[in-house]
Regions:
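ATP-binding N-terminal substructure of ATP-dependent carboxylate-amine bond-forming enzymes
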Residues: 1-114, 123, 145, 328, ...
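Glycine-rich phosphate-binding loop signature in dinucleotide/nucleotide-binding domains
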Residues: 78-84, 155-157, 194
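A conserved helix-loop-beta module that forms one wall/lid of the active-site cleft
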Residues: 104-175
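Conserved ATP-binding module of the ATP-grasp superfamily
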Residues: 134-136, 160-163, 175-214, 218, ...
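ATP-dependent carboxylate/phosphate-activation module, predominantly the ATP-grasp catalytic core
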Residues: 205, 211-277, 281, 299-321, ...
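Short acidic-glycine loop/turn motifs at beta-strand connectors
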Residues: 225-230, 288-291, 350-351
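A short glycine-rich, hydrophobically flanked beta-strand micro-motif that places a catalytic Asp/Glu
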Residues: 277-290, 431-435
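A glycine-rich beta-turn/hairpin centered on an aromatic-Pro dipeptide
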Residues: 333-370
């Protein structure tokens, strides 16, 4: 056997346990990233909505280990039998479980305390503040029955503010602006029915100087950490969010002055240190304010849409890097990769009032544009839309590349000129009902 063949066999023999969630990155993208690196061992729990339907596909793309209903000891035993060389999840709600399993299996991953900081917004903000990282003011929202704690919150909190779910919240789900303590109580009372807990954050004012008209004043820094060494791969720019805080568009590379870029990278690096992160791919959100940059949040996973944009702009394969890190490889970049074009991803959202889509027109014309590489209809006629879903409730997404930021601004205008979204509100059409009867 040749040395080359031996190397291929060594790579192919590696096994990565991936705790799967159907609302994370696609099976095809993950399998493609693993193709020359390792065999995937899909760890599945069919109590997670959408998982059972994916089992036939997962079985074609690796080994499936079903841990539904198993306790910790049985789960560890089932996974150990597969002899994994690494472990990974790309979903916040599975982060703490993955950390606990990694510790039992002696595999590299975030430790349990770091995983808690990634999935508990209050704990994360405490760690960032205590580490000297500039963050918005924040306050823990108590349970409704704790009258003394509510009096304290009323005395300490400032308004307007932003109310967010405290645990495992992704994509601006159920995130709202509140103007008073009464609005906070009302929202918490509604969420309490589902056992939801919340955190209240200072509403950060906008900084308009240094920001092109049409772009937002917040960015994200895409980083990796390998054995404690941080490499920063890109700064992702944003378009202004749809109400109340739903993402509408992202692009790599952000249009920033050199001074602002340095500030963003420094804030992201400080956040990584404050949380004690030693491994993984990270997504750090930063807002520029009149008083300087503030770290909004640090995610212990890859941001949605980032792998595609980073690849289109630089050629770097971020999902493959995440797998390599999980397998224990050392991956370090001396400097951020150079961008050749501007890569974008738009989430086109329904108006805040809309509850059911009745018509989407113009997608075929938009898809024919040479700047478009992918267009996906997420909510079609007859389907429900709900702003509470945050980013995930968008009507359609469109991704691709353009030559520069001027072309990006022009393309964003074209999307809204070309595509028409029609719908109804106030439950005029029940979810799954016939949109033809909307005007009846």
């Amino acid at each position: 056997m040749s040395a080359g063949a031996q190397a291929v066999d060594a790579v192919a023999s590696r096994r990565l346990a991936l705790l799967y969630h159907p609302h994370s990155f696609s099976v095809f993208a993950l399998a493609g990233a693993a193709r020359t690196l390792c065999e995937l061992v899909w760890i599945v729990d069919t109590t997670i909505d959408g998982t059972e339907a994916m089992l036939p596909m997962l079985e074609r793309m690796g080994t499936v280990v079903d841990v539904t209903g198993l306790d910790q000891e049985a789960t560890v035993a089932a996974m150990a039998a597969q002899r994994p060389d690494g472990i990974l999840t790309l979903k916040d709600s599975l982060m703490q479980r993955t950390a606990a399993l990694a510790e039992r299996l002696a595999l590299p991953f975030h430790d349990s305390e770091v995983a808690r900081r990634f999935t508990d917004k209050h704990l994360q903000r405490v760690a960032l503040r205590d580490g000297g990282v500039p963050v918005p003011g924040f306050w823990e929202v108590p349970e409704l029955a704790d009258a003394a704690a509510w009096e304290s919150l009323h005395a300490l909190a400032s308004f307007p503010a932003v109310l967010k779910p405290r645990y495992n919240s992704e994509g601006s789900r159920d995130t709202i602006r509140v103007e008073s303590i009464e609005q906070v109580r009302a929202a918490v009372g509604f969420g309490a029915e589902a056992g939801e807990r919340f955190v209240l954050e200072e509403y950060l004012g906008d900084r308009r100087d240094g920001v092109r008209a049409g772009f937002a004043d917040y960015v994200s820094v895409e980083s990796i950490v390998s054995n404690g060494e941080v490499s920063q791969l890109a700064v992702t720019g944003r378009f202004p969010p749809a109400e109340p805080f739903r993402e509408s568009g992202f692009f790599i590379d952000a249009e920033l002055s050199e001074a602002d870029r340095r500030r963003a990278l420094a804030a992201a690096r400080a956040a990584v240190a404050a949380l004690g992160v030693r491994i993984g791919a990270l997504h750090t959100e930063i807002k520029f304010t009149p008083d300087g940059p503030r770290v909004i949040e640090l995610n212990g996973r890859i941001g949605g849409g980032v792998p595609e944009m980073l690849h289109d702009a630089t050629g770097v394969e971020l999902l493959a890097i995440a797998l390599r890190l999980a397998l224990g490889e050392s991956v370090v970049f001396a400097a951020p990769p150079v961008t050749s074009r501007v890569a974008y991803l738009f989430y086109v959202q329904a108006p805040l009032w809309m509850t059911t889509v009745t018509r989407v027109d113009g997608l075929d014309r938009l898809a024919a544009d040479p700047a478009v590489s992918e267009l996906t209809l997420n909510r079609g006629p007859g389907q429900c839309v709900d702003w509470r879903e945050g980013n995930h409730g968008h009507v359609f997404s469109v991704g691709g590349t353009v030559a520069d930021h001027d072309a990006l601004i022009a393309f964003e205008r074209r999307i809204h000129d070309e595509v028409t979204i029609e719908g109804v509100g106030d439950d005029a059409v029940p979810c799954g009902g016939d949109p033809a009867h909307a005007a009846a």
